[in-house]
């Protein structure tokens, strides 16, 4: 079984997501399995060059994971025609400039979300990439989580009947950084550095809602900075200027009428649910609750008939009336799964719909969420133009 390699300039792999999910659990894992399986039976082997500012960290990562190349010179790395793909997991504030440079060098581009700090800039990047004839994609990992894939299977099968509502609960307690180390970087809590839970999570909720239930057509949001002061990585106290919790309501254009979705996102909540993310869907024929990996259902024929009576002990075990959705297959790491899709897209032109225009939709919803919070009102979510956009291969 033959194969060939494909070079990837990986910028930002010393950060939490860039390292754990993109380098270790995606690219290193793909290399360990012998490359990406192609339709003709060959294998496509990624050959990364690690790029960043910290020479010591880059060298250590390269040695640890058996990677031959690393550099602190992004321009030099982009100038190498042997590496046709550029990947960006740097800070949101600098991503657009990096992506523009990669486009100028003719690179195909895959990057973390959010694509940029505002919708106009995100659309501009999409148009520039199309004009340059390069392929482009944005990470939309939650679509490929086992729990969400099971939920999509239920939607496609018609299990729910007419979908009425979607309820999402996401978050966990992120320690302040004093008596226990924070699980997230300090820039997440500084709006001037691109932080904030709306900017982070509304990008996720946009693609999950759009691709699973229906296009988002309106948004209402209220947010808060519940923890006003935190401690950074160097032990210094700082003022949190970004929102750490957001409570959003969305109207979706479902196939059989509007669907109401509510998502609570918080880094200041203690978990009392099976997983860090829980999504409940209620329909006329049945309901489901999905997490990161699991999914449970309750059909109308299995729905109990409770009545309100606070004067007696609850006679129902409501959790017992739900059934697990079987795997019916194997689920790989969500980031790795999408990486393999994008690599095939670049190599042989297989379809890939999660492009910069899809990424711009996430930025748009985050912007409108922030505006809704500031103006304390509902806002329509208009369709974004795909001016000059190429059709998916």
Indicate where each model-derived feature is located.
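N-terminal Rossmann-like dinucleotide-binding module
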Residues: 1-65
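C-terminal capping/lid region of NAD(P)-dependent oxidoreductase domains
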Residues: 3, 134, 161-165, 371-393
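Glycine- and charged-residue-rich phosphate/anionic-cofactor binding loop of Rossmann-like
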Residues: 41, 46, 345-362
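Active-site loop of classical SDR/Rossmann-like NAD(P)-dependent oxidoreductases
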Residues: 53, 328-339
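Short acidic low-complexity segments
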Residues: 69-81
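Beta-strand-loop-alpha-helix segment that lines the small-molecule cofactor/substrate pocket
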Residues: 84-85, 91, 96-143, 158
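Predominantly a Rossmann-like dinucleotide-binding segment in NAD(P)-dependent oxidoreductases
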Residues: 142-240, 376
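Contiguous beta-strand/loop segments that form the cofactor/metal-binding neighborhood of enzyme cores
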Residues: 201, 206-302, 336-352, 367-369, ...
């Amino acid at each position: 079984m033959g194969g060939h390699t494909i070079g990837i300039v990986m910028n930002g792999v010393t950060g939490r997501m860039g390292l754990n999910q993109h380098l270790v659990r995606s690219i290193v894992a793909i290399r360990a399995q012998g490359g990406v399986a192609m339709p003709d039976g060959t294998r496509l082997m990624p050959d990364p060059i690690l790029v960043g500012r910290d020479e010591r960290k880059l060298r250590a990562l390269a040695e640890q994971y058996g990677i031959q190349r690393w550099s602190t010179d992004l321009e030099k790395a982009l100038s190498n025609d042997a590496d046709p793909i550029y990947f960006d997991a740097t800070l949101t504030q600098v991503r657009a400039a990096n992506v523009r440079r990669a486009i100028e060098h003719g690179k195909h581009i895959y990057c973390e979300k959010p694509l940029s700090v505002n919708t106009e800039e995100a659309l501009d990047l999409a148009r520039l990439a199309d004009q340059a004839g390069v392929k482009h994609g944005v990470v939309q990992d939650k679509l490929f989580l086992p729990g969400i894939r099971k939920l999509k299977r239920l939607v496609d099968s018609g299990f729910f009947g007419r979908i009425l509502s979607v309820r999402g609960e996401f978050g966990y307690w992120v320690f302040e950084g004093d008596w226990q180390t924070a699980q997230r970087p300090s820039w997440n809590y500084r709006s001037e550095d691109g932080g904030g839970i709306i900017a982070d999570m509304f990008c996720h909720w946009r693609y999950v809602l759009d691709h699973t239930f229906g296009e988002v057509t309106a948004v209402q949001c209220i947010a808060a900075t519940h923890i006003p002061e935190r401690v950074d990585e160097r032990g210094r106290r700082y003022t949190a200027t970004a929102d750490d919790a957001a409570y959003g309501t969305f109207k979706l254009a479902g196939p059989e009428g509007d669907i109401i979705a509510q998502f609570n996102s918080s880094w200041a909540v203690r978990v009392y649910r099976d997983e860090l993310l829980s999504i409940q869907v209620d329909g006329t024929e049945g309901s489901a609750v999905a997490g990161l990996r699991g999914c449970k259902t309750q059909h109308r024929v299995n729905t109990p008939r409770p009545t309100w009576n606070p004067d007696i002990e609850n006679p129902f075990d409501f959790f017992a009336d739900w059934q697990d959705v079987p795997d019916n297959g194997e689920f790989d790491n969500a980031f790795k799964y999408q990486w393999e899709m994008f690599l095939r897209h670049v190599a042989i032109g297989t379809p890939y719909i999660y492009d910069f225009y899809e990424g711009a939709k996430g930025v748009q919803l985050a912007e409108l969420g922030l505006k809704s919070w500031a103006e304390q009102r509902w806002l329509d979510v208009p369709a974004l133009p795909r001016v000059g956009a190429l059709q998916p291969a």
